[in-house]
Amino acid sequence: MVDYHAANQAYQYGPNSGGGNGAGGGGSMGDYMAQEDDWDRDLLLDPAWEKQQRKTFTAWCNSHLRKAGTQIENIDEDFRDGLKLMLLLEVISGERLPKPERGKMRVHKINNVNKALDFIASKGVKLVSIGAEEIVDGNAKMTLGMIWTIILRFAIQDISVEETSAKEGLLLWCQRKTAPYKNVNVQNFHISWKDGLAFNALIHRHRPELIEYDKLRKDDPVTNLNNAFEVAEKYLDIPKMLDAEDIVNTARPDEKAIMTYVSSFYHAFSGAQKAETAANRICKVLAVNQENEHLMEDYERLASDLLEWIRRTIPWLEDRVPQKTIQEMQQKLEDFRDYRRVHKPPKVQEKCQLEINFNTLQTKLRLSNRPAFMPSEGRMVSDINNGWQHLEQAEKGYEEWLLNEIRRLERLDHLAEKFRQKASIHEAWTDGKEAMLKQRDYETATLSDIKALIRKHEAFESDLAAHQDRVEQIAAIAQELNELDYYDSHNVNTRCQKICDQWDNLGSLTHSRREALEKTEKQLETIDQLHLEYAKRAAPFNNWMESAMEDLQDMFIVHTIEEIEGLISAHDQFKSTLPDADREREAILAIHKEAQRIAESNHIKLSGSNPYTTVTPQIINSKWEKVQQLVPKRDHALLEEQSKQQSNEHLRRQFASQANMVGPWIQTKMEEIGRISIEMNGTLEDQLSHLKQYERSIVDYKPSLDLLEQQHQLIQEALIFDNKHTNYTMEHIRVGWEQLLTTIARTINEVENQILTRDAKGISQEQMQEFRASFNHFDKDHGGALGPEEFKACLISLGYDVENDRQGDAEFNRIMSVVDPNHSGLVTFQAFIDFMSRETTDTDTADQVIASFKVLAGDKNFITAEELRRELPPDQAEYCIARMAPYQGPDAAPGALDYKSFSTALYGESDL
């Protein structure tokens, strides 16, 4: 065994190894290794993969151990005592490990392996389920897993392309380097490498003299792989880590083995990174510009779609033309509810997302030193907000108008039915009355007949007077239907006019007949008092029964328990009068029986009917029985309505209970979010975490709102129009909920933008807190923005010379144009941070991009399309070629392009 302390301690693996792999390199390793944990979850290795890993990992270890004059033969056995493992770690890290124990006992081996594992862990690596005992026992899975962890940490971790993770960075590097080669499509670290072309393409890209790529065939993978492995071993000092047959004969080569092999190519070619770094800078700048253009196009499209939807929806909400029937109005109400439930919520989310996208775009433009984005005319955020306010204004009161119209139509239907009922009863009563009044029977009647006719006429007049109220009610109902704009008012008016004309005619005929009867009354002597008394008492009683039947069959509409209880009380009062009415009925029938008894006892032959009235005892008994039948039916109808109103009251209280809980909860959350956005408790990440917890709690609260919506739906279906148990309406709750969602999303976006600004500009947490404290001090109304005077006072407090003089005003106007490019008159905290960070930190500039292009151009003042296509990805190379102006300098060559004017245009210093 070679003494590993004699190994070359000055060796450092890769450009970022050594001390960088110590404390500094381990800073992000925890996160990185957590990302790699899911690569090592299998309990058992596939035999083919295990074979590939053994060979690859053994070759990789020997490529480093040979620098210390040693090597391993069996990866399971040679690391069991921990000595070569510690030696390997010293070689690849360039650091000295604790002195190993030289004993041969198991405890000495475990201690040595633990020293190696402790050193790996000190680099920020999570060793999941790997223990010293398994390594000492020669556990193949644990040993291979440990070596893979070492390879990840010391050979792959520092590979980063465009801020990607190690694995993604290595894959992106391979994709870029092999992109120009036919039959090569690197998408992974297994089957993409089976045909060997990708290995040959990597070598040819960096050392084209070593490979004749055009002579390689895709259908000969073994030859391709052996060619690449032999060339790499002979000319690039990369040991052969895999057998071509093992790769070809495996359905899916081992990913870890391929990554280990490919990482050796990456480190071998790392010396060619200067041009790639320059290309990366240009790619990054172009990617930012392309992304910003994409975001601008998305904003314009989304804004146009949202404004078009608002334009189409507002006329529909402003259409307040009432319909003629309840069914039509209920359909309009259902359409409106469908709009609130289905159509509007996605648009609320689109509006919120549009504002977030706009703010994020502006932040990215400021951070990348680009001019502020000005949407096309009519598509500003303020235009969208104005359109949305117009939509809300049109929507306001629409549902209330619909419900009022339904109530109006319901009232109209009730009145129309009541009119038809009363009119039918009146028309039935008047049927034949005109013919009766026009009779001239008194001209040939006897004295007794005349007196009977007089009494009969008096009874008729009494009946006529009793019907006067009904006629007035009919006229009043018709008038109310006219005032409420009943759609069938023409037929109602025609029928009412006919009744009134007939009533006037009856009055005239009644008066004429009375005069004729009174003219002959002096010649009449006797009158049957009993019949007369019967008629006088029977007529009012009959009218009372008709009115009672009419009232008992009258429809009723109530909306509260108090109203139905009032009807029940009135009905109970009516029932209490029935005993007196029954006694009156018996008294009337007794009069009739008395007349019959006298006639029979005196042998008087009666005509069979009372000459003074048409109301017979049979009619009285029949109507009385009808009243007796209608009373329990009325009882049942009132009790059903009482049960319905009790159910409605339960719905009111149920809704009120939920609303009185949801409403204050929303208000409390709004206040807490406002407090969090103003206070400076903890880091921005803490604030963001706190806000996202609030957002999750808000989302988790959505079932309570859905429950309230369901209860509100039940209330609407029950046609309940008021609720005295709560001041919260569903409209208030919906608006509050929408405001809460918008506020939390906007607040989270503000904090994320602050983090983005802080990280991009290198602002410390203490600086961020100082900025927030200064901003809050002058934000007196806690509105989240400063007016010009407040902002000026804040600048003065920070030492800026913006006093009220010509020079100070000019400087202040310059600063305002930076922090408020849209001239809104307000400076947000995000704009304040952007300004302060711009004042205290450096940013990328057009000069840096020009310098990068100069590297790609070989220090020339111009660059050619061929150079761009060789160094940049195809899409970004074509982007530059399409936008670069021809170079006009004296040293111009054919096809020369001006990269300087193009670079300044990227930062708004000139036009593309």
Curated annotation (Swiss-Prot):
This is Alpha-actinin-4. Ca(2+) binds at D779, D781, E790. Residues 737-912 are annotated as: Mediates interaction with MICALL2. It comes from Mus musculus (Mouse). Homodimer; antiparallel. Interacts with MAGI1. Interacts with PDLIM2. Identified in a complex with CASK, IQGAP1, MAGI2, NPHS1, SPTAN1 and SPTBN1. Identified in a IGF2BP1-dependent mRNP granule complex containing untranslated mRNAs. Component of the CART complex, at least composed of ACTN4, HGS/HRS, MYO5B and TRIM3. Binds TRIM3 at the N-terminus. Interacts with MICALL2 (preferentially in opened conformation); stimulated by RAB13 activation. Interacts with PPARG and RARA. Binds to VCL; this interaction triggers VCL conformational changes. Interacts with SEPTIN14. Interacts with IGSF8. One of its GO terms (biological process) is retinoic acid receptor signaling pathway. The modification Phosphotyrosine is found at Y32. Residues 16-29 have a biased composition (Gly residues). The modification N6-acetyllysine is found at K115, K215, K593, K626, K780, K860. Transmembrane segments: none annotated. Keywords: Acetylation, Actin-binding, Calcium, Cell junction, Cytoplasm, Cytoskeleton, Metal-binding, Nucleus, Phosphoprotein, Protein transport, Repeat, Transport. Residues 178-193 are annotated as: Polyphosphoinositide (PIP2)-binding. The lineage of its organism: Eukaryota, Metazoa, Chordata, Craniata, Vertebrata.
